[in-house]
Amino acid sequence: MNLNFSNMNMSDLEEIKDILVSDFDDFWTYSILKDELNCSSSHYIVAKLNNEIVGFGGIKVVLDSADIMNIVVKKNFRNLGIGTSILNEIIALCSSLNLSSITLEVRKDNEYAISLYKNFGFETLGVRKKYYNGIDGFIMEKKIAK
């Protein structure tokens, strides 16, 4: 599979809006993502396969750390390694920005994502009780070697 990555821009938002509406039932909306793109501390990438956006991910930089805001893969492209590739790109981006760590929050019941993050060296730091509509969330962190 030949994925291409690029920085997300405003022209990508219409296609991403369709992914958010059909495939992502969480709290991210078109307007939130648009605001994120206008924020200087936010960095978002898109994954394209044959010029179709099949996923995206983003971070917000806080001091010398990054918070992963989201990693989203279109439903009919899941379990193909795209999420893994997006996470690889995010880690490379954080390294290029000379950041010291990456943090994220993940639903306790999202076993696939938790396993992926652990494989990349993320460790659980704590729990946010009932953070996701009554479901606990894990706070995870990965240190970046400089």
Please provide the spans of the model-predicted regions:
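Acetyl-CoA-dependent GNAT
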Residues: N4-N76, L87-E89, L93, L97, ...
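Non-heme di-metal
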Residues: M8, F120, G137-F138
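Basic, alpha-helical helix-turn-helix
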Residues: L20, T103, R128-K129
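Short, solvent-exposed loop/turn elements at beta->coil junctions and helix N-caps
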Residues: L33-D35, V127-K130
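Short beta-strand "wing" residues that participate in macromolecule-binding interfaces
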Residues: I59, T124-L125
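Glycine-centered loop/turn positions within well-structured domains
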Residues: A66, L80, F138
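Conserved glycine-rich acetyl-CoA-binding loop
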Residues: I71-N88, L97, S101, R107-S115, ...
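C-terminal "cap" of GNAT-fold acetyltransferases
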Residues: S100, R107-I114, K130-K146
